[in-house]
Amino acid sequence: MTTATPSVSTLEARLQRLEDIESIRQLKARYCAGCDADHDPALLGALFHDDAVWEASGIGRFAGRDAITGYFSALRATGRIRNSEHCAMNPIIDISGDTATGHWRLLMLYTANVPDGAPQFFRIIGWYREQYRRVEGEWRFQSLFCQVEEHAAYRLQD
């Protein structure tokens, strides 16, 4: 039994695909970090193309980088979220030239400030469906949709 040695161009294409997938994973990690940095609009805005769309079930749809950063600025200004932890996992990323799609599972824990009482703890379970576009070697979000499947309070045990 003999196995064919892949050509250099085949190996280069395979390597490029892996590099693209890793770049998109890093993009998603920066998105989660920006959300967990009190929804920092400057950090988050840099991850989206000018004509991108951000949408989440139960929240709304924001078209264009300015609208997206405006939403995150408004959310930050409420002071409602004390801290959060966005965990995006189990990615399925498909690359096609300078575009790609991604599907991620989401587990988010956050602490909400409550005006008349102790902070409350919540969890969100859901998923993301995303489209990415590479321009001048850099991957950014073209669209991000988050579907919340469950949003519930939880209690810490003493």
Features from the language model and the residues they span:
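Short, charged/polar micro-motifs that form catalytic or ligand-binding hotspots
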Residues: 34, 58, 118, 122
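Short, low-complexity N-terminal intrinsically disordered segments enriched in polar/charged residues
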Residues: 1-37, 41-42, 46
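General secondary-structure edge motif
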Residues: 11, 23-24, 48, 52, ...
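A beta-strand edge to alpha-helix "cap/lid" segment located at domain peripheries
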Residues: 2-12, 77-158
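A solvent-exposed, acidic/Ser-Thr-rich amphipathic alpha-helical stretch
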Residues: 41-107
